[in-house]
Amino acid sequence: MNNRKLMDLHIFETDATAIDRTGADALIPVQESNEIIQGIIAQSAVLSRGRRLQNMTSRQYRMPVLDMLPIAYFVNGDTGQKKTTNQAWDKKVITAEEIAVIVPIPEAVLDDAEYDIWAEVRPRIQEAFGKKIDGAVLFGAEKPSSWRDDIVKTATAAGSVVTLGSDLYTSIMGEDGVIAKVEDSGYFVNGHMADISMRAKLRGLKDTTGQPIFRSDMQTGTNYTLDGAPMNFPNNGSFDKSKALMISGDFSQLVYSIRQDMTYKLFTEGVVQNTDGTIAYNLMQNDMVALRAVMRLGWEIPNPINALKADKSKRCPFAYLKAGV
């Protein structure tokens, strides 16, 4: 139960709140207006960059991962004997955990709004879910105890961390840079995630031939690449630059499975409780409705053995750049 509370957004840190008339005032028009200025809806960077497995049919998903490689031998001449070898698999388990939120709102506010308030709320719920998922997977923020260590902690244990020095190019592209750390584990970097502050550091960064290594798509101007690999700047508030400035790696090794896709349910009866157990809202008595959103998913880093790095304690498909002291 404690495990579930960590990811259950309707277990409020403070007393329960609702969308009141003041909060929805911009949606209740005084004069005619047919547009609502929306901010950019930030989706989960982890789910968009990671590899989705088949949906889970139960709370746990068991995944076989190669743990021992076979060895071949030369046969010495015509009379030499052929030797045997072995191959083994380990099992990694993805455990689905629930993320949820409840949004109460008075019926009078819904009646007086010219716009569909629920249509405006739902994208923000998706953004909140994305922030919660990204924070837990990348940095372990409020992660359930059944989930594995986050990417930054995993990379730290494997020694795949680089402290930013005076030369940013060397810290990223050098022989002991972030990209080299991933390659030393037998993986190729196919993506980067970074704090928004890294954009200013990367502008104008050039390779030894004078060519920029940080580029944007000339057609859209929004898709960025670093050394040819796509780069994300999560803007949902999940990226903790105090722990990492940039995370690079083979994101095909970040896998996730969904037990229950995001579902919405509208309630007209029931109660919403505060943290101390007292009743904050009685939906029927207060003429309110509540939208509940629920999603269940889990993730894992398979990290199978490869020929370049047999020691799994030192093998990691991710590395990160952290700020210098």
What are these regions (language model features)?
Residues 90-93, 98-184, 319-325:
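Alpha-helical scaffold segments that mediate packing/assembly in large oligomeric complexes
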Residues 67-72, 100, 109, 131, ...:
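Short loop/turn segments at secondary-structure transitions that flank enzyme active sites
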Residues 28-32, 58, 116, 120-124, ...:
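Generic recognition of stable, solvent-exposed alpha-helical segments in well-folded globular domains
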Residues 29, 65, 71-75, 112-113, ...:
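Short helix/loop capping segments that flank catalytic or ligand/cofactor-binding pockets
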Residues 14-101:
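Assembly/oligomerization interface modules of large self-assembling protein complexes
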Residues 74-76, 115-116, 203-207, 241-246, ...:
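Short conserved micro-motifs at the rims of enzyme active sites and ligand-binding pockets
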Residues 57, 153-289, 295, 325:
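Extended oligomerization regions of viral-like shell subunits
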Residues 2-27, 52, 71, 76, ...:
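Protruding loop/beta-arch "assembly-hinge" segments enriched in small, turn-prone residues
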